[in-house]
Amino acid sequence: MTDKTPFYITTAISYPNGKPHIGHAYELIATDAMARFQRLDGMDVFFLTGTDEHGQKMQQTARAEGISPEELAQRNSDQFREMGKLLNASNDDFIRTTEERHHETSRNIWNLMADSGDIYKDSYAGWYSVRDEAYYAEDETEVRADGVRYGPQGTPVEWVEEESYFFKLSEYQEKLLKLYEENPDFIGPAERRNEIISFVKSGLKDLSISRTTFDWGIKVPDDPKHVMYVWVDALTNYITATGYIEDRNGPRAKYWPADVHIIGKDIIRFHAVYWPAFLMSAKLPLPKRVYAHGFLLNKGEKMSKSLGNVVDPANLVAHFGLDPVRYFFMREVSFGQDGSYSEEGIATRINADLANGIGNLASRSLSMIVKNCDGQIPTPGAFNDDDKAMLASADGLLAVCREEMGKQLIHRALAAIIAVVSETDRYFASQEPWALKKTDPERMGTVLYVTAEVVRQIGILLQPFMPQSCEKLLDLVAAPADGRDFTALGEAGRLAPGTPLEAPKPVFPRYVAPEA
């Protein structure tokens, strides 16, 4: 096997009580870009996504449709798997919480927490949101004008009283605060970290971790009338897929603990409070980082079925093409903040950055090479200061992208790449290679060489975001098949003079809105 460094990244597992929407697609695209980046950078990556199929909400949705929860889970989980294929996600596994491997790990982690003395039986009475699968304190709820009591996410809550097992979360307050203090990067971005620290400082109550009022879930060991609270089961998926609890020497055990869990900001509490507490109790290693992205807004409004503005990712991809959609969401939205998008915004971004930017640069420079340099990469003369500065900008991109991607700041990595595209445009325009053709053909060759070399490096670095388009872009500059990972960046992989090129075909066509 490989001696590469393991890197384990996950999305949240999606709740399949409905069809996948653009919010699910956004998280999967972003996590896929991060996974691909690390693979190209020489890491041994394991990338996990999947579906979270238990809980009261699934049971209620299935009943409303007149089918069993199993049928609903199978049908909708398949739709999430299909979405992954549509988006060209490179996940190494797709986990379903209804799988036997997951039931086994969930029972194992429960028993480890019980062995630590952290689980006891009592009765629960309190406010519960079926939609959030979450319990809320009285002061987190409010009765609105319609007479209904709502939780902090704006979902209705109901009063629940039943026998329940509890986890001694109250005993983990100081341990969690110490974790956040000693590992400032455990939670990102900073707003979420501050939110969690303030929540934990305000005091933690023991957590109800089983239910008896429904049966669609994983049975509690030795007490089958109880099913596990869906979040005990759901969070455990991340460790299930590695087999770490069952066999520390198993083929995937090396991936635990996870390098980063990518999640939505609405589920930060489960991942940054409950999950590390469960793992501490089970005496298992903690993930290194939990990073919460924001919500996608449609023209500034939150998407909801009632507003009728929920976007199906398949429609967006059919309309604009896959890679342009992937690129838009990674470039336009600051990862970690809420972001707004519109079809006009996508069109503008495609045309500015892709068609007029990298596409135009590649097409102009490579067409000139094919036409004026016998259809092959020219041999450059001595590099002047402009050439050296241009190459240095391209050569320096990997370090910048590594740093930004390491902090999940995908939008900043892309902004840095596009800044170099703009710089190359200015370089190309100011050097006027078309005018040099008659006056100084060797200098023309040098300018074209430098430009093509920057296009090559841009093509390699954009692969995590637009894999299919960048494959075509790298074909245009005849980058060898084994010279497309990050070891080929910089001087190590410079274009070889004399390499034959074919006339470039457009990789990023302009988007023209269809006639109404």
Curated annotation (Swiss-Prot):
GO MF term set: ATP binding; methionine-tRNA ligase activity
Binding positions for ATP per the UniProt entry: K305
Keyword list, A-Z: Aminoacyl-tRNA synthetase, ATP-binding, Cytoplasm, Ligase, Nucleotide-binding, Protein biosynthesis
Catalytic reaction equation(s): tRNA(Met) + L-methionine + ATP = L-methionyl-tRNA(Met) + AMP + diphosphate
Residue ranges annotated as motif 'KMSKS' region: 302-306
PROSITE patterns to which the protein is assigned, alphabetical: AA_TRNA_LIGASE_I (PS00178)
The protein's role, per its UniProt record: Is required not only for elongation of protein synthesis but also for the initiation of all mRNA translation through initiator tRNA(fMet) aminoacylation.
This protein's name: Methionine--tRNA ligase
Provenance organism: Agrobacterium fabrum (strain C58 / ATCC 33970)
